[in-house]
């Protein structure tokens, strides 16, 4: 079930899923991309805007050791653009 526009939902993003796939020196940048993909998939959003605090939390312990899981609050809004239909935008902040 998709999140309705205007709703806020808390997700726990399992960042540890990428640890075996990605080399140590790429973990934090890949973790940011994983958060973006995870939220886009679960919120059914075309655009995901991540708060700088979420980025700082991922990078807090350096490039090699991102947190194994991260609780984030996601707010979904719909916006009309010229020449297009409505676009779903997900805003991600720390929970």
Swiss-Prot record:
<dbReference type="GO" id="GO:0002181">
    <property type="term" value="P:cytoplasmic translation"/>
</dbReference>
<comment type="similarity">
    <text>Belongs to the eukaryotic ribosomal protein eL31 family.</text>
</comment>
<dbReference type="InterPro" id="IPR000054">
    <property type="entry name" value="Ribosomal_eL31"/>
</dbReference>
<comment type="subunit">
    <text>Part of the 50S ribosomal subunit.</text>
</comment>
<dbReference type="Pfam" id="PF01198">
    <property type="entry name" value="Ribosomal_L31e"/>
</dbReference>
<keyword id="KW-0687">Ribonucleoprotein</keyword>
<protein>
    <recommendedName>
        <fullName>Large ribosomal subunit protein eL31</fullName>
    </recommendedName>
</protein>
<dbReference type="InterPro" id="IPR023621">
    <property type="entry name" value="Ribosomal_eL31_dom_sf"/>
</dbReference>
<keyword id="KW-0689">Ribosomal protein</keyword>
<dbReference type="InterPro" id="IPR020052">
    <property type="entry name" value="Ribosomal_eL31_CS"/>
</dbReference>
<dbReference type="GO" id="GO:0003735">
    <property type="term" value="F:structural constituent of ribosome"/>
</dbReference>
<dbReference type="GO" id="GO:0022625">
    <property type="term" value="C:cytosolic large ribosomal subunit"/>
</dbReference>
